[in-house]
Design a protein with these regions (language model features):
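A compositional/structural signature for long, glycine/proline-rich flexible linkers
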Residues: 5, 10-230
Length: 231
């Protein structure tokens, strides 16, 4: 009779699950320290202030957390989407109350097409951002005065490293470009906004299933964004 111990097939899987949990916990720990941990952003935003200002600081932090979770965890440069940044209950960084903002995550190695139709906005602009060191910089900005529209107000705008032949509206993607922000200005909230859509021009493989490494990387990016909120 063999009484020796033999590893069962499930044990390598269990070990990998424990390793995955550890990596996830590390990512969550970074986020916890950035938000509510002692000495984190929550303390930096509220320390030394009266109770009302402290409460506003923590409310600001919750808004940043909700927004950055959507931007850093859910948005994907391989499946681009324009997400509304501000709303009546999500406002931060001294936004303009007469402006409608949308955001998309980009990959500078890919090509994108924005298409849509003008509404009743007074101003329409597309702004590219990227990190130079630790500073988020404006890399390019194109507004309606720089663009061509058809008689019905429809337009196409291509974002790419090189300008394609025959394209009327184009913005160059710098190799550090990571974010697109659109702005529409209004004088009346009843004015109709522009219709905006974004799509990927390159054919790429379907997105893989989520991995612990990928989610952990996004959680750490989320932590870094939140940690810079008070700077």
């Amino acid at each position: 009779r063999n009484t020796g111990w033999t590893p069962r097939p499930c044990e390598p899987i269990l070990r990998e699950q424990k390793n995955e949990q550890r990596r996830t916990d590390e990512g969550m720990g970074d986020t916890d320290r950035a938000t509510g941990g002692r000495g984190g952003t929550g303390d930096a935003l509220s320390e030394g202030h009266d109770p009302t200002v402290r409460a506003e600081g923590y409310r600001f932090l919750t808004r940043i957390l909700v927004a950055m979770t959507e931007f850093q965890v859910e948005q994907d440069a391989d499946a681009p989407s324009l997400v509304q940044i501000m709303s009546p209950i999500r406002k931060f960084f001294v936004d303009n109350p007469d402006t409608l903002y949308h955001r998309a995550t980009l990959n500078s190695a890919l090509r994108y097409r924005i298409h849509g139709r003008r509404g009743e906005e007074l101003y329409l602009a597309f702004c590219l951002y990227g990190l130079r060191g630790r500073t988020n910089c404006i890399l390019a900005n194109v507004c309606d005065a720089d663009m061509q529209f058809d008689d019905d107000g429809r337009f196409d705008l291509v974002l790419s490293a090189e300008r394609p032949d025959g394209v009327k509206n184009w913005v160059q993607l710098d190799n550090i470009a990571r974010t697109l922000v659109t702005r529409q200005y209004f004088t009346n909230l009843r004015q109709k906004p522009a219709e905006l859509n974004i799509e990927l021009l390159d054919e790429i493989a379907p997105p893989p299933a989520p991995t612990v490494e990928g989610i952990t990387r996004r959680l750490r990016a989320l932590s870094q964004k939140i940690g810079r909120a008070h700077v």
